[in-house]
Amino acid sequence: MKMNKSILMLMLGATLLGSCDIERFPTYSMSDEQIKNNPASNLDALLNGMYAQLKSWSDPMHRCGEYAGDNMVIRGSSTDAFFEFISYSRTPNNYRLQSFWDSGYKAIAQASNIINMIDEGQSTEIDNSLGECYYVRGMMYFYLCRAYGRPYYQAPEKNLGVPIVNGTPDNILDLQLDDRATVQQTYEQAINDLKKAELLLSTNRGPAYASKAAAQAMLSRIYLYMSGTYENPNREYAQLAVDYSNKVIENSDYSLLPCEEFMKYNTIVPENNPEDIFVVKRVASEYSGYDHYYGIGGMYSNIGGMGWAEMYASEKYIDLLNETGRNDWRPASKKIVDARANFIEPTYTEDNKEVFRFVYVGSDGKKHYAQFDTKHNGDKVSCTDMNGNSYDLTLVSADDEYYTINYNGTEYQGMIDNYIELNREYPQFYIVKCSREGEDSQLHSPVISRLGEIYLNRAEAYAKLGEYDKALTDLNTIRNRSIVNGGYPAGKLNADNAFELIDKERQLELAYQAERSYDVFRNGHSLTRDYPGPHNQHEEVKASDYRVTYYIPQNAINAYPGTLTQNPTDNSGVILK
């Protein structure tokens, strides 16, 4: 019996993905003969199916990228599989990682299906559609490899990336697939696909669809990931990161939002946002009832009664926002110093009760928040704890209302503020960067590439090339957009502080876009989370730690037609050079 290639690709996808049910693949799959006879009329449906896979993929993509970083804090331990991302307690039986793997390979399978069935050169429109497929496939290989593979500077020719499966093998009934490609080979596949996309893409249909600029933006990031560390840079790849960044920055289709508009960035629908290059587009009709609880923003806030609101901005991130001056979120005296602080919304109580908030080290050796009621007596300020003990406060900054307190024999600095509602012991600093897109809800289209990132990519690449003046110009472009006169003075950036200053800006700018943990480890640095929260506050996760990579899902290994090697289960198996 002869099977058409579409069915074979579905079989291949189901075999590769393990837990996926063939019946769950889109019903609009059609035979290769139908497609080849009339490609123009069928391509839209096929492309829609490919893009649809990104919607389910983007949820675990965000969680495994963002939760492993230091921008957020969870209210307490959780039985949800995502808590493993926060706690670094890696296991191979994590359903969210399974979903990330499955959805990623579904997108790869559907993109490959279209590429293999339709010939190039029939028309500009068809070539553009093929370019979209190459973009999605290349992007997906990169995202999968950065989660399941080691940072590129660590022996990429030895460490394993992910399996490369770009079409239907000739012998589908006796299928044997190759083991995981190396990190180097996986990156090469992603680069080749994205360069092919760049060549074929000629029409910009907006940020919900792949475009030439989207391919160039992703190449900018990939080459940055390949550019080594600040201490040992790879100049060839750093220059390529600059080259591809130039192509995007010089494209008149895109521009940075001015400060006032950027403060509302999360509310602007992507098609009206000149900064967005590629997003995973979501629309309100995809959500009904309690669906908003389960969106990305639903863990960060409660909007309109929807959302779990169990994760908040970390003390570390709040301190970074306040570094150039206090951001005052109180309704009666609101003053945003750093535009990015507008994506944070503390849940003040309605009575506007004044407190002195600070972080202290408890008898358990961990950091905790305290909010003590204040009392004013002329120009003197004191506060009272829950046991009725009174403490005099010493003024540090009248403008910012910063004071110090001697508490349990140690001096701590804090601020006068209104009382913020607690979830367990943590003030609810809601994160709304992933909410309110076009409406007051949890609607959000996850951002894959935007222009702000590209300036920072180029800044880092310039720094690794030793061109610090050019790096500073790009760095200040982003700082001055968010902070009035926030740019560093000429000559400030140098070899000694380049990582610190550029990494800090990437954290501020790209927070809650699933970039943070990867940014830390790819440059050979450690992740520390020395701030209040239920996580291990004293742990240093080094870039050499085996937990930097996620485990391959066990279901995928069990169902794989061939050997699918698992990642190391302890540090002894990590290859660094």
Language-model features, listed with the residues they occupy:
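Aromatic-residue-lined binding/catalytic grooves and analogous aromatic/hydrophobic interfacial grooves
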Residues: L201, A213-E261, D276, Y290-H292, ...
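"A position-specific structural signal for the A-helix of alpha-solenoid helical repeats
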Residues: S129, V136, Y143, M218, ...
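Membrane-proximal, proline-rich intrinsically disordered regions
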Residues: C20-G65, G486, Y531-K577
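Sec-dependent bacterial lipoprotein signal peptides
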Residues: M1-G18
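Short coil/turn linking the two alpha-helices of tandem helical-hairpin repeats
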Residues: Q122, C145-Y152, R205, I222-N234, ...
